[in-house]
């Protein structure tokens, strides 16, 4: 059985006339140096001008300074501090510990001039910390994650870094509209958007019409987007729906639209490749992105 081709829709946004700026591309460094300045140079050698934050503790002031200065010296922006834990863990002690971990993560992001600290909003699943649960789409979930976002931001009071919740296919925010509603409910300038369109593709309609999905995200969330993920999605045909992540260019995501819209955002928003298995897959994915970028008149340099 063959999967029909993806529909590429026209955007209502004036993409052709909008000014475009170079996109900062980033990804992980395999076997990277522990020295921040050397690690930043390794990023540049790979063609990257954005990076994931190196490991660092909040109380290690010297390393925080070295990361901030070493990456800035080499014009490499730290896109995100990822703190991956369940802010809605059923165990009160673990939930409190996880909340503090994200507070520390946002404080680290502020110290190293990262664009954001990112985590999923959480899950009520008792067995898998990021897993599906019926209540992950409920008002109870929405209210709890809004309260957590306020607590985290109010504890740090960042002036530059944003707190973001990663989009998910089975937990809020699971759409542009639910993210926009969350932004309004949190009501803090330091709450931003981390765009991961592949995570939103959870049904055939979104898979086939991912161009429209991308345009909706940029149209509705553009002013708040501070960092983005790059991966691709393929439909493996089975007796039920099964989408799998694949290297860029091997799936269905409309990167012509993604790159065009990203290059016209008002901010300098990094695009971070993720979830690939080897340095070779990242290099091939970067090659694909640069080819598409050239076709649509977008630069990474």
Regions found by a protein language model. Name each.
Residues 1-13:
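N-terminal export signals
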Residues 14-17, 73, 92-193:
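Active-site acidic/histidine proton-transfer and metal-coordination neighborhood
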Residues 16-20, 38-45, 60-80, 104-113, ...:
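Acidic (Asp/Glu)-rich catalytic clusters
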Residues 23-28, 51-53, 78-83, 117-119, ...:
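Hydrophobic faces of well-ordered beta-strands that scaffold small-molecule active sites
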Residues 29-37, 53-65, 86-90, 125, ...:
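Acidic-and-aromatic substrate-binding clefts and catalytic sites of carbohydrate-active enzymes
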Residues 43, 51, 71, 81, ...:
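Conserved, mostly hydrophobic/aromatic
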Residues 81, 147-247, 252, 261, ...:
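Acidic/histidine-rich catalytic cores of soluble enzymes
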Residues 282-300:
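C-terminal helical cap(s) of enzyme catalytic domains, especially alpha/beta-barrels
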């Amino acid at each position: 059985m063959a999967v029909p081709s993806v529909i590429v829709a026209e955007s209502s946004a004036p993409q052709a006339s909008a000014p475009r700026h170079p996109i900062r591309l980033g990804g992980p460094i395999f076997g990277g140096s522990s020295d921040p300045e050397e690690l930043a140079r390794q990023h540049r050698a790979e063609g990257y001008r954005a990076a994931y934050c190196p490991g660092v503790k909040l109380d290690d002031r010297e390393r925080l300074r070295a990361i901030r200065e070493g990456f800035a010296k080499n014009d490499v922006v730290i896109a995100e501090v990822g703190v991956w834990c369940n802010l809605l863990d059923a165990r009160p002690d673990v939930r409190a510990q996880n909340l503090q971990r994200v507070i520390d993560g946002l404080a680290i992001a502020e110290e190293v001039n990262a664009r954001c600290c990112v985590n999923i909003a959480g899950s009520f699943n008792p067995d898998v910390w990021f897993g599906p649960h019926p209540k992950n789409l409920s008002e109870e979930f929405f209210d709890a994650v809004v309260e957590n976002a306020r607590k985290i931001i109010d504890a740090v009071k960042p002036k530059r870094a944003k707190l973001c919740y990663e989009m998910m296919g089975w937990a809020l925010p699971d759409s542009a509209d639910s993210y926009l509603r969350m932004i309004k409910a949190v009501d803090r300038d330091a709450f931003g958007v981390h765009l991961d369109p592949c995570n939103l593709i959870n049904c055939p309609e979104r898979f086939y019409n991912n161009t429209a999905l991308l345009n909706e995200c940029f149209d509705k969330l553009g002013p708040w987007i501070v960092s983005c993920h790059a991966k691709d999605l393929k439909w493996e045909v089975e007796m039920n729906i099964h989408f799998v992540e694949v290297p860029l260019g091997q799936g269905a995501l409309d990167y012509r639209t993604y790159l065009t819209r990203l290059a016209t955002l008002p901010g300098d928003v990094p695009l971070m490749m993720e979830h690939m298995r080897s340095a070779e897959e990242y290099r091939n994915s970067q090659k694909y992105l640069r080819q598409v970028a050239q076709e649509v008149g977008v630069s990474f340099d």
